């Protein structure tokens, strides 16, 4: 289309004024509320609805933060590297660091205090009685690849009663390395058999760094379990499978294809 100069000039001026008018309609205003976050909304809804039995956690699904459908995290890290003899791949580690890697206390002279916690979501135990045979079992270890807990350090398990008070039901004060072992407790006190039951693990140690480490795995709460809680029957990977590469855990495909025979490790060993 061949437009004369006056017409093209008028079109250009019209477009300029339209752009200025449109630009004038935009104003920067502060947010009046936080935009909804679908992920956070799902987590919050999981916290509102009580968990039902059986409660089962082997820490194999989530890495880093524990499963928000089951837990309220207070600093623990789900990993597979802080212990060399876990019952299966994945466990939660307690130490003196927050989840973001910062210490709870910046003063190295503070030798003991509460550090990481791991709290269950609300669990509905309403309608159960002391005769319902509710059992809780878990596997735990001390030190592993971290520092050995000191004399005043401990790992504590607490139950929340009907009045909302936390009652200590188990603790251990390991002064030496302890490989993973199991513990089984009866939940047969009527104070704990209510609709808003919770339990939590609390670590006490040096809160200024990666000290006084504990690990936790296979946390199970169930009624009349059809298995022996002290005998795990789980077809599971016990550690991270090693790389099929000879020299690396991973490498660019282009580099591998240059010499696959050289880069491939012995997959039979």
In which residue ranges do the predicted regions lie?
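Bacterial N-terminal signal peptides that target proteins for export
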Residues: 1-11
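Extracellular carbohydrate recognition
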Residues: 111-117, 149-150, 205-224
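Extracellular beta-strand-rich recognition modules
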Residues: 59, 120-144, 195-205
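Extracellular carbohydrate-recognition regions
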Residues: 26-85, 222-251, 256-264
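Surface-exposed, low-complexity/disordered Ser/Thr/Gly/Pro/Asn-rich loops and linkers
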Residues: 75-130, 215
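Contiguous beta-strand segments within globular domains
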Residues: 115-120, 129-139, 250-269
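N-terminal signal peptide c-region/cleavage motif recognized by signal peptidases
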Residues: 19-21
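Extracellular carbohydrate recognition and processing domains
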Residues: 163-192
């Amino acid at each position: 289309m061949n437009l004369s100069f006056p017409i093209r000039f008028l079109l250009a001026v019209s477009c300029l004024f339209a752009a200025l008018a449109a630009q004038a309609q935009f104003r920067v205003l502060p947010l009046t509320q936080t935009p909804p976050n679908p992920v956070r909304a799902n987590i919050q809804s999981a916290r509102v609805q009580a968990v039902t039995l059986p409660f089962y956690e082997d820490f194999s699904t989530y890495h880093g933060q524990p499963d928000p459908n089951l837990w309220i995290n207070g600093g623990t890290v789900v990993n597979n590297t802080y212990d060399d003899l876990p019952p299966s791949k994945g466990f939660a580690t307690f130490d003196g660091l927050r989840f973001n890697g910062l210490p709870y206390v910046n003063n190295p002279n503070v030798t003991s205090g509460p550090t990481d916690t791991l709290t269950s979501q609300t669990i509905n135990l309403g309608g159960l009685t002391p005769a319902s045979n509710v059992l809780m079992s878990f596997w735990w270890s001390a030190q592993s690849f971290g520092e050995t807990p000191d004399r005043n350090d401990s790992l504590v398990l607490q139950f929340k009663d009907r009045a909302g008070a936390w009652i200590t039901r188990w603790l251990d004060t390991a002064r030496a390395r302890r490989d993973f072992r199991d513990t089984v407790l009866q939940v047969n006190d009527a104070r704990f058999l209510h609709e808003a039951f919770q339990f939590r693990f609390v670590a006490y140690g040096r809160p200024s760094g990666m000290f006084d480490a504990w690990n936790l795995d296979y946390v199970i709460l169930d009624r009349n379990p059809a298995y022996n809680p002290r005998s795990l029957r789980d077809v599971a990977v016990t550690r991270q499978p090693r790389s099929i590469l000879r020299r690396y855990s991973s490498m660019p495909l282009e580099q591998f294809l240059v010499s696959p025979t050289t880069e491939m490790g012995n997959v039979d060993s």
